[in-house]
């Protein structure tokens, strides 16, 4: 491959972030997916997933059965730009009847966002999916969701993460209040307090105001004092971001918020860009590392039929592992030992 072409591939690789979202059913995974699209500008109004007739359906829930039941059955691949990066987001099924699709998807990503219901913590399906992530040494970012509702104590949730899945939590944002009193988060990296204002039905981006901790302390209140006490404890035990252990799948940066009201969504999406790794070389069938600028190769992780109800079709979703894809090129199918035009 020529040097200019190799350089372009390297540049594009650095701009890519490919990740999946895993969760137990109804933890808010598909709603979070929709809100990522909202904050990226890919959609102008978000439609949260609810199991009721007459409500808007999320963009990633496209099958009739998904829209009827308000759940994700098949993995959806979404691509959108954000902060001069190309984001590939794989919205995976959480319901156990459809989890085989999820396992295949986790072989195609570079990182994972694990969504936990803050009132329930780690649930059975999340635990199963996390074990697949661990077997692949995938970096995991954690989002404690639904803080706009009555929730468990955040310190207790951190203890549960470490005890149940042996993943050391390193909180990045920390809640001020919960339920109806949830007003914002403290960003431990910047030492600022972000105050959120709800929008109608959460259909548009939440209004955000950044304050210094000194400015925020003027608001006072029991919730604020409790937050300061907890932050002091986190600082004392050294619960800060550790990039090497995160990239090795040994620790997890933790963010808090509410996908439904958009609280904390932007900070989580920023973290995907800032913390999640870009694509790296992968082993081929001979277990040899294939350089990113080597001739084209790809891993097909999903084949979907009849996506368009107007005609019969069959589409393969593939993760490009090396080189450049050009429409109409001829490739070798290593499983069938044949060639095909793509």
Labelled PLM ranges:
Residues 1-339:
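Structural and coupling elements of P-loop NTPases
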């Amino acid at each position: 491959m020529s040097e200019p072409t190799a350089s372009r591939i390297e540049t594009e690789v650095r701009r890519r972030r490919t990740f999946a979202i895993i969760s137990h059913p109804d933890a808010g995974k598909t709603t979070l997916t929709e809100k990522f699209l909202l904050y990226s500008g890919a959609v102008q109004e978000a439609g949260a997933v609810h199991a009721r007739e007459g409500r808007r359906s999320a963009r990633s829930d496209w099958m009739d059965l998904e829209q009827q039941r308000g759940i994700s059955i098949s993995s959806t691949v979404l691509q959108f730009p954000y902060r001069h990066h190309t984001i590939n987001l794989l919205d995976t099924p959480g319901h156990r009847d459809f989890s085989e699709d999820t396992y295949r998807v986790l072989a195609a990503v570079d990182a994972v966002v694990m969504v936990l219901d803050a009132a329930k913590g780690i649930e059975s399906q999340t635990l199963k999916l996390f074990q697949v992530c661990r077997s692949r040494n995938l970096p995991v970012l954690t989002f404690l969701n639904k803080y706009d509702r009555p929730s468990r104590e955040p310190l207790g949730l951190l203890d549960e993460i470490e005890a149940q899945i042996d993943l050391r939590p390193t909180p990045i944002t920390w809640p001020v209040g919960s339920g109806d009193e949830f007003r914002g988060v403290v960003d431990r990296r910047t030492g600022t307090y972000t105050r959120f204002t709800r929008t109608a039905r959460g259909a548009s981006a939440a209004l955000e105001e950044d304050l210094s901790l000194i400015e925020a302390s003027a608001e006072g209140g029991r919730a604020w004092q409790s937050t300061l006490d907890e932050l002091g404890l986190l600082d004392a035990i050294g619960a800060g971001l550790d990039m090497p252990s995160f990239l090795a799948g040994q620790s997890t940066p933790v963010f808090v918020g509410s996908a439904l009201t958009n609280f904390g969504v932007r900070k989580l999406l920023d973290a995907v860009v800032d913390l999640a790794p870009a694509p790296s070389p992968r082993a081929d069938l001979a277990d040899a590392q294939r350089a990113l600028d080597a001739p084209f190769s790809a891993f097909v992780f999903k084949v979907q039929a009849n996506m368009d109800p107007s005609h019969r079709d069959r589409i393969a979703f593939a993760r490009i592992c090396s080189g450049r894809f050009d429409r109409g090129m001829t490739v070798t199918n290593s499983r069938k030992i044949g060639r095909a035009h793509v």
